[in-house]
A protein has these predicted regions:
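Class I SAM-dependent methyltransferase SAM/SAH-binding core
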Residues: 57-99
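Short alpha-helix
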Residues: 200-216
Length: 244
């Protein structure tokens, strides 16, 4: 079982979903949140071919579908996540972002909270860029380095070493840490588990990420609003650009 299989199988279990009701509901509220995060409008993906790279259980795949996408290819490294995503998207499949070959056919490519779980993030960004057609949009979210101190060394340059401690904990102990974070910092159990559980959780400045976009030939680069999954302001770099 990978880090992410544990996350999607156990933390998406009935007990924890009940405690965090609504986080992964496929509803109009989810679509409205996605619109705010990306700057897309109603029918903003009408007739478009889209890719959700690292789709998890499919919350953003659903939003992309509702914004009019003609087709959404969704993939994830976790078989447990794909089981969930397939309920809404028959095109969901198991794959690894590191295995992507250049394939610039997509009008919209999303990589939400995925790149920073790879040791060679810049190389993975290039792989994501290679999927976007001319005039298409790439939207990514990675962790913001400025707020690493809120994550008890589980995020940023210390994450790999800190993960060795995490692996020694029981699942119940891990959940307890997340519950305490919810009490002191806000957010939800899944959001904190998602931050603490992966072996690699690197972080970057908005300036670094913007430079990646420029180097890969994107313009109209925009830093968007933060996510609402945890309460720490701007704890994520949420950015998109248009392939020129």
């Amino acid at each position: 079982m990978t880090d992410f299989d544990e996350q999607w199988k156990k933390v998406m279990g009935e007990e924890y979903v009940r405690k965090n009701k609504g986080i992964f509901d496929f509803t109009q509220k989810r679509v409205e949140e996605f619109k705010k995060l990306t700057g897309l409008e109603d029918n903003g993906l009408d007739g478009k071919i889209c890719l959700d790279a690292g789709c998890g259980p499919g919350r953003w795949t659903y939003a992309i579908q509702q914004l009019g996408a003609k087709k959404v290819d969704s993939f994830d490294i976790s078989s447990e996540a794909i089981k969930l995503c397939k309920k809404i998207n028959p095109n969901a499949h198991l794959d690894n972002i590191l295995a992507l070959k250049p394939n610039p056919v997509y009008d919209f490519v999303l990589s939400w909270g995925v790149l920073h779980h790879n040791k060679n993030v810049r190389d993975v960004f290039t792989k994501m860029s290679s999927q976007v057609k001319e005039g298409g949009m790439l939207h990514i979210m990675v962790y913001n380095k400025k707020y690493d101190h809120e994550y008890d060394s589980y995020r940023g340059d210390t994450s790999i070493e800190k993960h060795k401690e995490w692996e020694k904990l029981s699942f119940e102990e891990k959940i307890k840490i997340c519950e305490n974070k919810v009490k002191t910092n806000g957010g939800d159990i899944h959001g904190w588990f998602d931050a603490f559980n992966p072996e690699v959780s690197l972080s970057f400045t908005p300036e670094e990420v913007k430079e990646w976009f420029k180097e890969e030939g994107f313009d109209k680069i925009k830093l968007m609003v933060k996510s609402h999954f945890n309460s720490i302001p701007t704890s994520q770099v949420n950015m998109n650009g248009i392939k020129s």
